[in-house]
């Protein structure tokens, strides 16, 4: 809390993403400026799903629809939304530190250019792919991503915050989907043991690849200096394989 109180700028994606941040965003913390990225972008975030304690017995394909006007809270998984996030943060930095505004703007332009290239890469992968469906063996944080690139998806669990294990019937249905659609690759999430993916691969002969949500990184990843762009470019290569 002391660090928060001494901060010139306190940033969050949105209240419905970092539900724990409400107290930190109370003006009594004394931080200099408060930046709610989603609000500044004019986005209304859907409530972040809570953990489910029970195993799931249905795979999820476009099952959960948000209230009209709301978007999934994981906005950074969409490279176009990510560009908006960079612009909002840059504007805040320029207000706080106008002396270095040109420095921030220059770096922002360079980074946004890289995000635009990333977006173009995903569009190319989808345009040249043999299929338009991807399969996730665990939790799912890519609704904005799949909507941006007009991809269908099947996921074993319907929420990123869901820590339950998919049930046997769910796994069996996904195995059938992989076989029927000739899916070459299924995805698993970072920082988890891909047990479900291993089962599906064992039954179908498909490969499994990491599709990183860029939500958290391991200590090794952090120490190696990975960032959003490197993780998403890895996702791009894995997506090309999955759509081949």
Description of each model-found segment:
Residues 1-244:
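Extracytoplasmic metal-acquisition and chelation regions
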């Amino acid at each position: 809390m002391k660090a928060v109180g001494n901060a010139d700028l306190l940033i969050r994606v949105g209240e419905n993403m970092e539900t724990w941040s409400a107290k930190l965003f109370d003006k009594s913390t004394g931080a200099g400026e408060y930046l709610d990225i989603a609000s500044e972008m004019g986005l209304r975030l859907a409530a972040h799903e809570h953990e489910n304690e029970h195993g799931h017995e249905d795979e999820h394909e476009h099952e959960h629809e948000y209230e009209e006007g709301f978007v999934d809270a994981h906005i950074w998984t969409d490279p176009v939304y990510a560009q908006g996030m960079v612009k909002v943060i840059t504007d805040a930095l320029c207000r706080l530190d106008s002396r270095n505004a040109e420095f921030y703007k220059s770096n922002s332009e360079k980074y946004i250019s890289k995000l635009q290239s990333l977006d173009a890469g995903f569009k190319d992968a989808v345009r040249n792919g043999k299929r338009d469906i991807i399969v996730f063996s665990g939790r799912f944080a890519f609704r904005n991503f799949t909507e941006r690139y007009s991809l269908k998806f099947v996921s074993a669990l319907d929420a990123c915050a869901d820590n339950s294990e998919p049930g046997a019937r769910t796994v069996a249905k996904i195995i059938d989907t992989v076989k029927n659609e000739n899916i070459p690759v299924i995805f698993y999430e970072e920082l988890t043991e891909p047990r479900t993916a291993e089962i599906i691969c064992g039954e179908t002969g498909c490969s499994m690849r990491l599709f990183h949500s860029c939500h958290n990184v391991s200590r090794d990843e952090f120490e190696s200096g990975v960032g959003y762009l490197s993780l998403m470019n890895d996702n791009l290569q894995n997506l090309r394989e999955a759509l081949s």
